[in-house]
Regions:
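Short aromatic/basic micro-patch
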Residues: 75, 141, 187
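Short, amphipathic alpha-helical interaction segments positioned at domain boundaries
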Residues: 58-63, 117-140, 191-210
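Polar/charged alpha-helical tracts
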Residues: 64-68, 83, 158, 162-165, ...
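Accessory beta->alpha helical hairpin/"wing" motif in late/C-terminal subdomains of nucleic-acid enzymes
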Residues: 33-52, 96, 107-125, 178-192
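Non-catalytic regulatory appendages
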Residues: 174-235
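Phosphate-backbone binding and catalysis cores of DNA-processing enzymes
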Residues: 1-91, 97-107, 227
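Contiguous mid-protein beta-loop-alpha structural module that forms a pocket-lining wall or clamp
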Residues: 115-183
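A local structural micro-motif
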Residues: 90, 106-108, 144, 175-176
Length: 236
């Protein structure tokens, strides 16, 4: 998925001892920002640049003052950034929010605000393809509508369908009516087809509503239990 949201999300995916994502900050140069989907997420700098490329929002002229101040990779605390900016509180708050939401500013593991390297890794369309492809590979099976919901509507449905078609042509995905008693068309990772035949889930865990898997399964949970955001116990 190109990042991790929280310590709890990490705990479900790592066997043995682990630390909070921020504790890996210096070793892996992790940053936190509003990635895609639009959650506060820890990831490495390269992935953050790709997310920024995909979002493709240029900073407004009035925001460039903050960018110039936060250019060091160590970043600046919010209070120090405000003090140096010379801006009034409301303008500073709005400018900081715009830059953070667009990934022109991110936060270091210590919580300081910093910029990312200015050079692109991908052009916007290619960056969005990369982001969507990795998201699909993470979950394994998606419908077009479910993918749109998973991305919180950030990428237009027409573009998502174009990406799904491209992944079909590249023989990464295959499609079909894969869910019992459902007329919804699904795409699944081609290489997974042989591995999942005859397999049933075994084990138990609590799926926290802050986990992206909970967002992925939210419609199924709503249909089965009539509930919105909630923690779900899986056991077999």
């Amino acid at each position: 998925m190109g990042g991790v949201r929280s310590e709890y999300e990490l705990s479900l995916r790592v066997q043995g001892r682990f630390f909070h994502p921020r504790d890996y900050g210096n070793e892996m140069e992790l940053v936190q920002g509003v990635m895609i989907p639009g959650y506060a997420t820890y990831c490495n700098v390269r992935d953050a640049i790709i997310y920024r490329d995909a979002r493709n929002v240029a900073p407004e002229p009035d925001d460039r003052r903050l960018l110039a101040l936060a250019i060091d990779s160590k970043g600046l605390p919010r209070e120090e950034l405000y003090r140096r900016s010379g801006m009034d509180p409301d303008s500073f708050k709005q400018s900081l929010a715009r830059l953070y939401q667009s990934l022109n500013l991110v936060r270091t593991a210590r919580g300081n605000y910093r910029t990312l390297p200015v050079n692109r890794i991908y052009e916007p369309e290619d960056a969005r393809f990369y982001v969507v492809k990795r998201l699909i590979l993470s979950f394994g099976i998606v419908s077009a509508e479910g993918l749109g919901m998973l991305l919180k509507g950030e990428i237009p449905m027409a573009e998502l369908r174009k990406i799904l078609l491209r992944l079909e042509k590249e023989e990464i995905l295959v499609k079909g009516f894969l869910k019992k008693d459902s007329e919804t068309l699904y795409w699944i990772v081609k290489d997974d087809m042989e591995h999942i035949k005859g397999h049933l889930f075994q084990g138990s865990f609590v799926l926290n509503q802050g986990d992206r898997l909970a967002h992925y399964l939210s419609e199924d949970v709503k249909k089965k239990f009539g509930l919105g955001a909630c923690n779900v116990i899986f056991s077999s």
